[in-house]
Amino acid sequence: MPLTVIWVFFDLGSTLIDETAADTRRIKEMISGTDVTEEAYREKRLEMIRKGRNGDLSEMEYFSLTKTPWHSEDEIPYPDAVPTLIELKRRGYKLGVIANQNYGTERRLKNWNLHQFFDIIAASAELGVAKPDPAIFEWALKQADCCPQNAVMVGDRMDNDMAPANRLGIHSIRLKRGLGAYHEPQSDDEIPEHTISKLSELLDLL
């Protein structure tokens, strides 16, 4: 990784934040009162992800399920999130968030004791633009007064994180965890510059 990296931007879900409990709760609520089992839903979701289709909406359509609310209060930071962020700040990196999130991202970051680490928060609901639209990345770069080549994007999604970063010239690092671990590149744009399996490995790249 070039020594000119100044800014490190992070996705939230399945990158810094563990959404497992919230995901499980939504599935249970959606299938309640139907003959769809949680196992069947999860198997179909993985099947569609492996085929290159994003999860949730495809499975909901397949099983004719109604989307239920997402419970952000069930989300928690991964154990490796805070130690990694602390070390990056110690090394002098500027940190930011670029994430597709419901309203209230700053409040949730404060509840998770993560807000203190970030200089810029680009959240889709507040900005009115969502990944993979390059505009949300361009907004973050403008706020940071940073050239793309001096920035890194860390995320789990090939389509929402890696592809737009690559197209803009931002260094891309894929974190293989959560459902994103099952994604396969659908185009050359989605191939990350680096791939890591745990967040602490980021420290060896920077």
PLM ranges: what are they?
Residues M1-V8, D18, V36, I76, ...:
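Asp-based, Mg2+/Mn2+-dependent phosphohydrolase catalytic module
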